[in-house]
Regions:
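N-terminal, polar/Ser/Thr-rich
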Residues: 1-35, 110-119, 126, 131, ...
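Surface-exposed beta-strand/loop patches in extracellular or lumenal glycoproteins
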Residues: 39-58, 130-133, 139-148, 419, ...
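A surface-exposed beta-strand-loop module
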Residues: 45-112, 133, 169-170, 174, ...
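Beta-strand-rich binding/interaction modules
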Residues: 60-67, 432-435, 445-532, 649, ...
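Extended, low-hydrophobicity, Ser/Thr/Pro/Gly-biased non-transmembrane segments
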Residues: 95-198, 561-564
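Short acidic/polar inter-strand loop motif in beta-rich domains
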Residues: 98-105, 470-471, 536-541
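Hydrophobic alpha-helical and helix-loop surface patches within well-folded domains
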Residues: 176, 204-458, 462-465
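Long, ordered, helix-rich scaffold segments
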Residues: 350, 377, 522-872
Length: 872
């Protein structure tokens, strides 16, 4: 295991001494023992070298030949096969064996249900055969697969199917050819028996592309939405980005056992079934929108990731940040831009900001990595996307698209860097991004402090803006960044005040580039109310001393819907902080009438999108509130939020009931109007369930559950009963279990409710459910739903002072450490942030981390996080 302990540094990048230009892979498939033959055309790049280093893990080497002759000049050491005394160009033939059924880590070739499938990103290909498993080695792949026809009637790989045949022994074979050079992480193979949904897409140049969606037998009725989403994504990428699909066929396979969400393998995407399967009885509105987003994300990788890939894994955000931006734009263009923006920002504030403040803090382009799987993070993906969005804000759509076209023209068919992308944007737009580049190298969440002054005599309004990024675990020193600050000013009547300076109109996006700057605006006839950081124009924390009255004003008058929501969030945040302090002092909790009135006005407004109203009325999560504090008190935060929730529920009870009863929706459709109405109606139900009138709450919730004709409404009722601990809760949960226990994806929703239940006996219940008929520790979706929801989504119970939550996670991690290190590494996150808590909890969590560190075969995934946490 020693090779897993060695850190790699971005600055140490060296091009390979040799590269592989073509590879022929021949698989003789069997779950117990699969024979892999790899025949590669290799050529020297470094004239000084005659040694080829290949990576290989858990492989049995059978034979090795160079130009058709047995080659003995090689050695195996620490996960590498080092072949020496090689000529300038040669054909390398390697035969090895692997055992897919023993592969519980789900990296490389493994068993998922009755099928065989692969996951090769980041470094999974080395679990299939010996290879230069690095993203800057791009080869053309031809793949032949042979297997038992009755067991595996479908044999799939990248590219186009070029030949197939049958053998006398009941087996058959298929040969695939991918004409586009690609790195090994984009290789894919799937073998199994599926139901197939077939359709086509005609590109803008008139080419017909066959579309095939493979799902488990019996799930065909849950595939049409994913197919529609794929066609929408292909059309959108042509219209918005001018990018057209390049193969004759595009395939998606849904599998139940998958560590990630989905994988963009060239022409053959492998998806977690969670992001493919949907029908109204089993999937919620959120599921439908997530499927649309993830289908889009993986398709968009065809250009931003596959045709242009990463030079090395430190550049991961080059493909992921850009592609997340693209999938967010896709969802925004097809649905509600403001709702999508708000949901993206909620992830940033609740989870990415927490990552910045953790021992695993890193820039979007990391400098140092031990286990690459640990850097598929919210920072690389979500913050990476915010960095791309800032470039879009600074350049505008037209220049941004010119930059994309230049980037594609320069780098198509190659492995590029983040610097290459920024350079293309700069060259296409003539906008200086030299200071902006610091976003790629500097970690942490900047704090933007804004103060203002108004001069009635001069009719001038001045914003004093300063920026500061607190030190992070990986960087002590911080420098000023280029921060686009989008603002708007309002007069007392709610009208927008034009931004003017020296007689000219000023752009609403202010360029904050120094540690402190002043921005002066003329012809401002009265003191304005500023709307700051509109659209969340930069991934920063804002410090401006808004009064309650100003926030209520913005909730009503801000022209930007995100800003209306953000004002409501800040108002609640203020009282969450006030009430946590009051709890510490033993004082009575408060939520003034004017705050309730501000929220009542939103609920009763006739000119607001119901989806926006629902989001404004939805309180920040306990994890979001936690980010407001230096030292997190999970019990006080829970009680403060609970108080605010129940106060609004009781004070606005009649209004919630009126709106709840007034919303009628005929049938189930996936369109923004209906989704918006359902979300507002179900938000009202959550509040009604939390009110003092328990009898009415129980009646309403049970009635909705019993009459629901779709999973969105059914689950909303169950969630309301779960959070409020209503009398009907146990019976409804039992009914749901009886109805859906055979369906893993639906049961994940039920397991998540069990894990997030605020009741004091939740951990006891979670432990019992580890033996539930629908639960399996071998399935990452089940583990995330039950265990992950408790450890990451139920802070008041996970952080119980008796350490029971920490001990539970310890036991789970010991199990997963060898079974599936990637899933273990995700689950450990709440523990490694122990320094955010009080001294007692810190000691208890540190104790668990020390015990884990002492495990005999601690995986590299866990070792890296535990070590960083204990050393921070």
């Amino acid at each position: 295991m020693t090779q897993l302990r060695q850190a790699k540094y971005r600055q140490d990048y060296q091009a390979p001494d040799y590269t592989i230009t073509e590879i022929f892979l021949d698989f003789d498939l069997d779950p117990a023992k699969t024979k892999v033959t790899a025949i590669s055309k290799v050529k020297r790049l470094n004239p000084q070298s005659s040694t080829l280093e290949l990576f290989g893990e858990d492989l049995t080497l059978i034979s090795l030949e160079v130009d058709g002759k047995a080659w003995t000049n090689y050695k195996e050491e620490s996960g590498k096969l080092i072949i020496e005394s090689l000529p300038e160009a040669f054909t390398l033939s390697i035969v090895n064996e692997i055992s897919p059924e023993k592969n519980s880590a789900l990296e490389g070739l493994y068993v998922s249900g009755e099928a065989l499938c692969t996951q090769c990103e980041a470094e999974g290909f080395r679990h299939i055969t010996y290879y230069q498993d690095r993203p800057d080695v791009l080869a053309r792949y031809t793949t032949k697969i042979t297997a038992d026809k009755s067991r595996y009637p479908y044999l799939l790989s990248n590219g186009n199917r070029i030949a197939e045949g049958e053998l006398d022994d009941g087996r058959h074979w298929v040969k695939w050819e991918d004409p586009f050079p690609k790195p090994s992480y984009l290789f894919a193979l799937v073998a199994g028996d599926f139901d197939v949904l077939r359709d086509e897409f005609v590109t803008r140049t008139g080419r017909k592309v066959a579309l095939e969606l493979f799902v488990d037998k019996g799930n065909l009725d849950r595939a049409p939405w994913a197919m529609k989403s794929l066609q929408n994504a292909m059309k959108w990428d042509e219209e918005r980005f001018g990018l057209e699909y390049d193969l004759d066929i595009y395939m998606i396979v849904a599998v139940d056992f998958f560590n990630m969400g989905a994988m963009e393998n060239k022409g053959l995407n492998v998806f977690n079934s969670k992001y493919v399967l949907a029908k109204s009885e089993t999937a919620t509105d959120k599921d439908y929108l997530n499927i649309e987003s993830v289908i889009g994300h993986e398709y968009f990788h065809n250009w931003t990731g596959n045709r242009i890939t990463c030079r090395d894994w430190f550049q991961l955000s080059l493909k992921e940040g850009l592609t997340v931006f693209r999938d967010q734009e896709f969802s925004s263009d097809l649905g509600s831009r403001s709702v999508n923006r708000i949901n993206n920002v909620k992830v940033m504030r609740a989870a990415q900001f927490a990552e910045d403040a953790s021992p695993m803090a890193h820039p979007i382009r990391p400098e140092k990595v031990i286990e690459m799987n640990n850097f598929y993070t919210l920072t690389v993906y979500e913050k990476g996307s915010e960095v791309i969005r800032m470039i879009h804000t600074l350049l505008g759509e037209e220049m941004f698209q010119a930059g994309i076209q230049l980037y594609v023209h320069r780098h198509d068919g190659s492995a590029a860097t983040c610097d290459d992308f920024v350079q293309a944007m700069e060259d296409a737009s003539n906008v200086d991004l030299s200071l902006f580049r610091r976003w790629y190298s500097q970690s942490g969440t900047p704090v933007l402090t804004v103060r203002d002054e108004y001069s009635p005599e001069k009719q001038q309004y001045t914003l004093h803006v300063s920026q500061m990024t607190p030190p992070t675990a990986d960087q002590a020193e911080k420098q000023p960044l280029h921060i686009p600050l989008d603002i708007e000013l309002y007069g007392e009547d709610g009208a927008v005040i034009p931004l003017k300076r020296d007689g000219s109109l000023v752009n609403s996006v202010l360029n904050v580039t120094q540690a402190s700057q002043n921005f002066v605006f003329d012809h401002v006839t009265s003191r304005p109310v500023p709307s700051l950081l509109r659209e969340f124009s930069a991934p920063v924390k804002l410090d401006y001393p808004y009064t309650d009255a100003q926030l209520a004003f913005l909730m009503q008058h801000a022209s930007n819907e995100f800003s209306r929501w953000d004002a409501a969030q800040q108002l609640i945040n203020n009282y969450a902080k006030i009430n946590v302090e009051k709890l510490h002092k033993g004082e009575a909790l408060v939520l003034p009438e004017h705050v309730v009135d501000a929220f009542r006005a939103v609920l009763l407004s006739d000119n607001i999108d119901p989806a926006l109203a629902a989001l404004i009325l939805t309180l920040p999560s306990e994890n979001e509130i936690a980010e407001l504090f230096t030292v997190i008190d999970p019990v006080a935060i829970h009680n403060a939020i609970d108080f605010i929730h129940s106060t609004l529920a009781n004070e606005m009870h009649d209004e919630f009931l009126t709106v709840y009863r007034s919303i009628k929706i005929d049938g189930y459709r996936v369109d923004h109007g209906d989704i918006a109405l359902r979300s507002l109606r179900n938000t009202c139900l959550q509040y009604l369930a939390a009110a003092d009138d328990r009898e009415l709450a129980n009646k309403l919730v049970e009635a909705q559950y019993r009459s629901a004709d779709n999973m969105t409404d059914s689950l909303a009722a169950l969630t309301a009963a779960n959070e409020a601990g209503l009398p009907c809760h146990a019976e409804l949960m039992s009914d749901f279990d009886d109805r859906w226990h055979h369906d893993g994806l639906v049961m994940d929703k039920w397991f998540t409710l069990q894990g997030t239940n605020p009741a004091k006996n939740t951990l006891e219940k979670v432990r019992e459910l580890l033996n539930h008929r629908s639960f399996s520790m071998t399935n990452p979706n089940r583990v995330r739903a039950l265990v992950g929801s408790f450890t990451a989504g139920n802070p008041v119970n996970f952080h119980a002072e008796d350490s029971s939550g920490y001990q539970f996670l310890y036991e789970i991690l010991v199990d997963l450490n060898t079974r599936n290190p990637q899933v273990a590494s995700r689950l450990i996150e709440p523990l490694i942030r122990f320094k955010r808590y009080d001294a007692k909890r810190q000691d208890l969590m540190r104790e668990v981390l020390e015990k884990l560190k002492g495990l005999e075969n601690l995986s590299g995934d866990l070792f890296e996080k535990i070590t960083k946490a204990l050393e921070s």
